[in-house]
Regions:
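Active-site/pore-lining binding-face segments in mid-to-C-terminal subdomains
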Residues: 110
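Glyoxalase I/VOC metalloenzyme domain signal
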Residues: 1-21, 25-48, 58-107, 122-214, ...
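Short, small/polar residue-rich loop motifs at catalytic or cofactor-binding pockets
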Residues: 113-116, 274-276
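Short, Lys/Arg-rich nucleic-acid/phosphate-binding segment
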Residues: 50-53, 116
Length: 295
């Protein structure tokens, strides 16, 4: 049972996010196998092969860089990345990727979070990937979350936020599209979900970077944060691996670095050091982070 709940204001605003995700860097056990999976399953294209990594993304931008160096696949009892979410800008593209995954025989879990539609899958090392279509316009308000997730849509219907998507209905939006086409150019890193040792210190840390608290479920060991609007699930964290877990070993597959882009002046934070035009540090999950501005 969920013991305590804190929910920030969930009013949807037209304000631009203060922060967005830049390039995400992952360490894998077999670089060639990983590149083959990410390109075949998701339709990412190779943008750069400068040693030692391979940059993958859309025709417009790099989303991830895969690095060799991991010796063992993902193991659960450590902090680090829980999953990486890649966002689609349209229902048609989301549905087309679902069709692609099915055609490629990739195991996938289509899930309706109400605020978003999501497709969950894993790469060969066990890294979890989420393909998401953000749908904040479907969400109205939270119910009594002390007894489990209860989300109300704009028609007043309650949802668990964890139900299955209607696959047939989703695929209808991809009718006539080529599932084997590359990912649309406007694909983007939608959010990162971390495994952390404790919620409160991690929430405090990310607040100094410009994120704001949204939903905190202490009894469920989960919290998420926004960065302005319209989506309030720009960063998530959990303690499901257990409290006070150590960071992932250096030889394990996982997230090794990510960029955050500030849309405006950089926030003053004691947790990152200045390095030329950027700020660098290590987050509460033990992952290297670079914060830069787009101005």
């Amino acid at each position: 049972m969920l013991k305590s709940v804190a929910v920030a204001d969930t009013t949807i605003s037209a304000q631009r996010d203060r922060l967005s995700w830049g390039v995400v860097e992952l360490q894998v056990t077999d670089l060639d196998r990983a590149v083959a999976f990410w390109t075949s399953a998701l339709g990412l294209i190779v943008r750069d092969t400068a040693a030692p990594g391979v940059a993958l993304g859309t025709r417009v931008r790099t989303l991830i860089v895969l690095h060799p160096g991991a010796v063992v696949p993902v193991k659960a009892p450590f902090t680090g990345m829980y999953h990486l979410a890649i966002g689609m800008r349209s229902q048609a593209e989301f549905s087309r990727l679902l069709a692609r995954l099915i055609q490629r025989n990739v195991p996938v879990a289509p899930t309706d979070h109400l605020m978003a539609k999501s497709l969950y899958l894993h790469d060969p090392d066990g890294l979890e990937i989420e393909i998401t279509l953000e749908t904040p316009e479907r969400f109205s308000h939270f119910g009594d979350m002390s007894r489990g997730p209860r989300l109300y849509d704009v028609d007043g219907i309650v949802h668990s936020g964890r139900g299955p998507l209607d696959v047939r209905a989703e695929l209808s939006h991809a009718a006539g599209a080529d599932p084997m086409a590359p990912m649309a150019g406007d694909g983007y890193v939608a959010h990162l979900h971390f495994k952390v040792a404790a919620l409160e210190p991690a929430l405090n840390w990310f607040e100094t970077l410009g994120f704001e608290r949204h939903l905190t479920l202490d009894g469920w060991g989960f919290a998420d944060m926004g960065a302005g609007a319209p989506n309030t699930h720009r960063l998530a964290m959990n303690t499901w691996a257990g409290p006070n877990r150590p960071p992932m070993p250096q030889d394990m597959a996982g997230l090794v670095h990510y960029e955050l882009i500030a849309h405006g002046d950089l926030a003053a934070t004691p947790h990152l050091r200045q390095d030329g035009d950027v700020r660098r540090g290590t987050d509460p999950a033990g992952v290297a982070v670079t914060l830069r501005t787009d101005i």
